[in-house]
């Protein structure tokens, strides 16, 4: 019989200071919020971004920005550890990130979206050989980490990612859903997608050790 389990104490969690956090290696992932209106959601995205070591959060358009009591409350102060920047227009952030070598990904339900479970962000050239052009994004013929950088765009609570931004993206990524609503809160979507990329990154690093 397995021994009794227990919750970890706060001192056992391996938490780092804001200064140490900023010294950690970059993940190659940034989050772009396209006119997200809720300060609570923005704070939640900061909190999730801190957990998965997102390099930066871009707050675009009408997004609330720090300092904000609601952002601070829902984010547990993560806006102090995760770098952020405000852009008046999401397209300005998109073009800048493209010029910096990021693959631009809209997290949105579209006609040609790639389902998240089929997305392999850190697949090597060899693992993608023999893949059809239509499924190129699903295998990510891109070279191993850390050569690939992703800008993940999450949209407004009502309208989602704007069509202009979708058009400017390299591809769209969709979270498979099976219920009646086919709608997740933006902060929940961010958590699902960021965990997927984190899991793939961990798998890639573990495979390289074999």
Model-identified regions with their sequence ranges:
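Post-transcriptional modification and biogenesis factors for structured RNAs
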Residues: 1-210
């Amino acid at each position: 019989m397995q021994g009794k389990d227990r919750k970890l104490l706060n001192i056992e969690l391996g938490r780092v200071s804001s200064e140490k956090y900023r010294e950690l290696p970059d993940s190659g992932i940034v989050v772009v919020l396209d006119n997200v209106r809720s300060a609570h959601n923005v704070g939640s995205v900061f909190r999730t971004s801190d957990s998965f070591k997102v390099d930066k959060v871009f707050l675009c358009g009408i997004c609330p920005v720090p300092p904000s009591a609601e952002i601070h409350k829902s984010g547990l102060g993560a806006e102090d550890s995760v770098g952020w920047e405000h852009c008046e227009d999401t397209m300005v952030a998109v073009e800048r990130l493209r010029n910096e070598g990021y693959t631009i990904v809209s997290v949105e339900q579209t006609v040609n979206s790639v389902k998240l479970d089929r997305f392999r962000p850190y697949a090597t050239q060899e693992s993608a050989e023999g893949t059809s052009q239509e499924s190129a994004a699903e295998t990510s013929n891109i070279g191993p980490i850390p050569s690939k950088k992703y800008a993940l765009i999450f949209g407004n609570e009502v309208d989602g990612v704007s069509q202009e931004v979708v058009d400017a993206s390299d591809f769209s990524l969709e979270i498979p859903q099976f219920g009646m609503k086919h709608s997740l809160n933006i902060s929940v979507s961010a958590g699902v997608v960021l965990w997927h990329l984190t899991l793939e990154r961990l798998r890639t690093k573990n495979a390289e050790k074999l």
